[in-house]
From Swiss-Prot:
The keyword Iron-sulfur appears for this protein: yes
Reactions performed catalytically: chlorophyllide a + oxidized 2[4Fe-4S]-[ferredoxin] + 2 ADP + 2 phosphate = protochlorophyllide a + reduced 2[4Fe-4S]-[ferredoxin] + 2 ATP + 2 H2O
Gene this protein is translated from: bchN
Protein name: Light-independent protochlorophyllide reductase subunit N
Function: Component of the dark-operative protochlorophyllide reductase (DPOR) that uses Mg-ATP and reduced ferredoxin to reduce ring D of protochlorophyllide (Pchlide) to form chlorophyllide a (Chlide). This reaction is light-independent. The NB-protein (BchN-BchB) is the catalytic component of the complex.
Cofactor(s) the record lists: [4Fe-4S] cluster
EC assignment: 1.3.7.7
GO MF terms, alphabetically ordered: 4 iron, 4 sulfur cluster binding; ATP binding; metal ion binding; oxidoreductase activity, acting on iron-sulfur proteins as donors; oxidoreductase activity, acting on the CH-CH group of donors, iron-sulfur protein as acceptor
Extent of the signal sequence: none
Keywords: 4Fe-4S, ATP-binding, Bacteriochlorophyll biosynthesis, Chlorophyll biosynthesis, Iron, Iron-sulfur, Metal-binding, Nucleotide-binding, Oxidoreductase, Photosynthesis
Naturally occurring in which organism (per UniProt): Chlorobium chlorochromatii (strain CaD3)
InterPro entries per record: LIPOR_BchN/ChlN (IPR050293), Nase/OxRdtase_comp1 (IPR000510), Protochl_reductN (IPR005970)
Positions contributing to [4Fe-4S] cluster binding: C25, C50, C107
Pfam families: Oxidored_nitro (PF00148)
NCBIfam families the record matches: DPOR_bchN (TIGR01279), PRK02842.1 (NF002768)
């Protein structure tokens, strides 16, 4: 159950180190954002590396005509002042008829100092806006590219009049989860203004000075701050709605913003009971979370309240005000921003956690050394929000533990034999 909600942020053992994140670049957000905004097209100005990444990561064949594409930078483009994309954009309009085109930056053109904002403005028309989205891996974690997309959409959200008090949920979720969240709000008597983003460009929610913004993803601090400053909206600072504990606090805090007092402790208890079999398997398990998705804080909080022992929770970026409630709920837990991965490796080898939640890039080496691993990317792609997502969330953690329990004893040599012949010679 809930513990530590009233403590100071300083009580969390918050440490900042100096490492880069072993994670995808922001282009990965295309995988879920193009499916969410159904009348959009995502155009990336990038290199062959970007093309290979998206082709492999998203598993799309070219004949499927997905609503994203890459304008390749070749050697000859390095001598040009600015890339020419007018023909590409005209082809996109003819083939896909999008209502909006998002122009995403990548590492190489950013190093070349391409004026993406000016390029997008030049390509934009009243009928089909072209919006610049900074998405390279030079600055942002891959989930923060969604933050950039939502920030680009702000000018296209209508102005809600003063006195119209409704909640707008910030964050991309599938249509089924959005319907569940809307139903949960309406059941509590909370008027809903919509979601940012909605599934169509012309359906973006009206936002004004009396709008309450409820972030449902922990990596959307910039768009929340932008709307607060530009529209005067109120940002809900609560736990994020992951797990029974987070869902209860989120909905109680949101209802309070509308002058509604609700007690959801019974519903929280029923949700914990619903996943008792899963939490029984998590109790006492040592879990280590490496930095990847920026979901790590709420995931660690859920695991802790489910009975797991959190050895370390690390995240690429931690924004103290935006993540305040999650940090309070993790007081006493070692929380690390921009962790040094080499130090983490030594800690993991020494402490031998029962479960490591980590990125796709580091998962296989951990498995090869005998550890049980959960891909952190999976939490991005599954419906794990609010009450309807409780079972899915718990199952994601339990599945690798159950799988390992059904396998024969791990033979490390099967993975490592011949991997480093030079090491064998000197052994």
């Amino acid at each position: 159950m809930m513990q530590g909600i009233g403590g100071d942020i300083q009580d969390s053992q918050l440490i900042r180190e100096d490492n880069v994140t072993h994670s995808f670049c922001g282009l990965a957000c295309v995988g879920w954002m193009y499916q969410k905004i159904k009348d959009s097209f995502f155009l990336i100005l990038g290199t062959h590396t970007c093309a290979h990444f998206l082709q492999n990561a998203l598993g799309m064949m070219i004949f499927a005509k997905p609503r994203f594409g890459i304008a390749l930078i070749e050697e000859g483009d390095l001598a040009k002042n600015e890339p020419t994309l007018q023909e590409v954009v005209s082809e996109i309009k003819a083939d896909h008829h999008p209502s909006v085109i998002f122009l995403l930056s990548s590492c190489t053109p950013e190093v070349m100092k391409v004026d993406f904002k000016g390029l997008a403005d030049h390509l934009s028309t009243p009928e089909t806006p072209v919006l610049f989205v900074p998405a390279s891996g030079l600055v942002y974690n891959f989930t923060q590219a969604e933050d950039s997309i939502l920030s680009a959409l702000v000018p296209y959200c209508p102005q809600a009049p003063a006195g119209e008090k409704k909640v707008v949920f910030l964050g991309s979720v599938n249509d089924s989860t959005a319907a569940d969240i809307r139903a949960d709000a309406e059941e509590l008597g909370i008027p809903v203004g919509g979601f940012l983003p909605e599934s169509r460009f012309d359906k973006m929610p009206a936002i004004g000075p009396d709008t309450v913004l409820a972030p449902i993803q922990p990596y959307l601090s910039r768009v929340a701050l932008k709307l607060s400053r530009e529209r005067g909206s109120t940002v809900l600072h609560s736990l994020f709605p992951y797990g029974p504990d987070g869902s209860r606090v989120f909905w109680e805090d949101l209802a309070r913003e509308f002058g509604i007092t609700v007690d959801l402790r019974e519903r929280e208890a029923a949700a914990w009971e619903k996943i008792r079999k899963q939490t029984d398997k998590l109790k006492g398990k040592k879990v280590f979370l490496t930095a990847d998705t920026m979901l790590e804080l709420p995931l660690a909080r859920f695991l802790r309240h489910a009975g797991a022992d959190i050895m370390e929770c690390s995240s690429a970026y931690i924004i103290k005000k935006f993540h305040a409630k999650e940090l309070e709920a993790l007081q006493g837990v070692r929380v690390v921003e921009q962790p040094n991965f080499h130090r983490q490796l030594e800690d993991i080898r020494r402490e031998r956690p029962d479960l490591i939640v980590t990125s796709l890039m580091t998962a296989n080496p951990f498995v090869g050394n005998g550890f049980v691993v959960k891909w952190s990317m999976e939490f991005m792609l599954m419906p794990i929000h609010s009450w309807s997502g409780v079972v899915s969330l718990a199952n994601l953690f339990v599945a690798p533990l159950q799988r390992r329990s059904m396998l024969p004893a791990f033979d490390e040599s099967v993975w490592l034999e011949g991997a480093m012949p030079s090491a064998e010679v000197h052994a």
